[in-house]
C-alpha cells in the first residue's frame, strides 16, 4: 500500500519545524519526542504525514540543502567576477546565520550517516558532489573569461576548496573557536588568488 500524506501544508510545516533540529542533533539524536516538541503535533499527526522518522529526516535534509543552495545562488548571482562568485561561498560558510542553524547540513549529515544510514549518506554525497560541480563550473568559466590561469585544474581546485571550507567548519565547531574558521578561509582565499591572472 502506497503512503499518502494527509496534507501538503502540514507536511511542509513539519519539515520546516524539524529541519534545524535534525541539522543540530542528527538523525540518531532526534527522538519522536523532539519532533513533537518542535512541531507541537502528536506522533500520530507527524506519522500521518510521513511514513516514519527516516522520511522526516530525509525531507528535513532536502529542505536544509535547498535553503543552503538558495543562499549560494543569491550570493553567486550578486557577484560580478568569477573570483567573487567563488569567494561568495566562503562568505556563506562564515556567516553566523549558518552556524546558528546547526552548520553545514552536508557535513553534519555526511559525518553522522557515513556508516549508519545509507539513504542520508547518499543525500549528503549528492549535495557534496553538486557543490563540487558548481565550483568546477565557476572555475572553468573563469578560465574562459581569462580571470583564472589557463592551466588551473578546476576539479582539483574545487575539491581543495571544499576540503578547506568543510575542514574549517569542523575545526571551528569542534574547538568552539571561530577564529580558526577565519584563518582557514583566509588560506582558501589565498589559494584562489593564486589561480587569478594578475
Label every model-predicted segment:
Residues 54-56, 109:
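A secondary-structure capping/hinge motif
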Residues 50, 58-64:
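Alpha-helical DNA-contacting segments of helix-turn-helix folds
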Residues 39-50:
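Short hydrophobic/aromatic patch on the recognition helix
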Residues 59, 73-102, 154-161:
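Hydrophobic alpha-helical connector segments
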Residues 99-119:
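Amphipathic alpha-helical segments used for helix-helix packing
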Residues 1, 88-96, 129-141, 145, ...:
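C-terminal peripheral helix-coil segments that are non-catalytic and often amphipathic
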Residues 1-25, 29-41, 55:
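Basic, helix-initiating cap at the start of DNA-binding domains
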Residues 152-171, 187-191:
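Hydrophobic alpha-helical segments that form the core
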Amino acid at each position: 500500500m502506497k503512503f499518502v500524506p494527509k496534507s501538503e501544508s502540514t507536511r511542509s510545516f513539519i519539515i520546516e519545524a524539524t529541519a534545524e533540529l535534525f541539522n543540530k542533533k542528527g538523525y540518531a539524536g532526534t527522538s519522536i519526542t523532539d519532533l513533537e516538541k518542535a512541531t507541537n503535533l502528536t506522533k500520530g499527526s507527524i506519522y500521518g504525514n510521513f511514513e516514519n522518522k527516516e522520511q522526516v529526516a530525509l525531507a528535513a535534509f532536502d529542505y536544509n540543502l535547498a535553503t543552503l543552495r538558495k543562499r549560494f545562488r543569491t550570493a553567486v548571482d550578486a557577484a560580478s567576477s568569477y573570483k567573487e562568485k567563488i569567494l561568495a561561498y566562503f562568505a556563506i560558510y562564515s556567516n553566523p546565520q549558518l552556524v546558528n542553524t546547526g552548520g553545514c547540513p552536508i557535513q553534519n549529515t555526511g559525518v553522522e550517516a557515513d556508516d549508519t544510514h545509507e539513504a542520508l549518506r547518499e543525500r549528503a554525497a549528492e549535495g557534496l558532489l553538486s557543490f563540487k560541480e558548481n565550483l568546477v563550473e565557476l572555475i572553468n568559466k573563469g578560465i574562459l573569461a581569462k580571470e583564472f590561469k589557463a592551466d588551473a585544474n578546476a576539479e582539483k581546485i574545487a575539491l581543495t576548496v571544499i576540503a578547506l571550507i568543510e575542514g574549517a567548519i569542523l575545526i571551528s565547531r569542534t574547538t568552539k573557536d571561530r577564529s580558526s574558521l577565519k584563518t582557514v578561509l583566509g588560506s582558501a582565499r589565498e589559494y584562489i588568488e593564486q589561480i587569478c591572472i594578475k
